[in-house]
Amino acid sequence: MKEKYKVTGQLFLLSNLPICCFILKDISLVYARLLFVLFLFFTLYFSYKISIKHNVINRIHKLEWNKVLYCLAFVALMRLTVHLYLSSFGDTQNDALLQILKDIMGVELFNFYAIFVGPVLEELTFHGAIMNYCYNMSRKGFIISNILFGFMHCMNEPSIGIFIRSILLYSLLGCIISYIYYRTKRIEYSVLIHMLANFLAAIDF
């Protein structure tokens, strides 16, 4: 089990590596953005290599259209959940942090990261590594992976009450995504639903 935790830790550290470019001191924003792009491709490549080497996920195969349509229905469910939450409680602290990142990165680079790169790295770490690799798609793995997924998206909330309702929101979204992974046993479908959900959030749909 130690080896599995080690691999999961490697994937987690890699997934956060690109963002570190923007906390470096004495480096211009232009160079930080260039370094960020380089780190994105570096991180994607090595995260996938590690995942395949240790059987965290299966190799990627061509998508099946019936399963893609299945994913679209769950994307709609995710957006409905988010809209209900926002209409009741307003934006989360995670939304505010994402806006800060967007201002630093620029809209185009931020959207590329949020829509295409972030979902891949998060799915490999939380659902590929934790739910599947560490806990073999068990109920325990399902619960742990989605609580951690929720925690990572709301650890900066200003009060315990807001934190609790935010972690419930993001954990529920994680559950919807991981249910797709559980049913299909293919990480590309959970990545797809995650990408589509982030795309709709990016265009404020």
What are the residue ranges of the model-derived segments?
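Alpha-helical transmembrane segments in multi-pass membrane proteins
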Residues: 4-51
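Residue-level signature of transmembrane alpha-helical entry/exit and packing/kink sites
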Residues: 7-11, 32-37, 63, 67-71, ...
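Alpha-helical transmembrane segments of multipass membrane proteins
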Residues: 14-22, 39-43, 74-82, 122, ...
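Juxtamembrane "helix-exit" motif on the non-cytosolic side of transmembrane helices
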Residues: 19-28, 82-92, 154-158
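Membrane-interface helix-boundary motifs at transmembrane edges
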Residues: 26-29, 54-65, 129-137, 181-185
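Non-cytosolic membrane-interface motifs at loop->transmembrane helix junctions
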Residues: 29-36, 95-102, 161-172
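Juxtamembrane helix-loop-helix connectors linking adjacent transmembrane helices
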Residues: 53-118, 161
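Transmembrane helix-loop-helix hairpins at the membrane interface
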Residues: 107-205
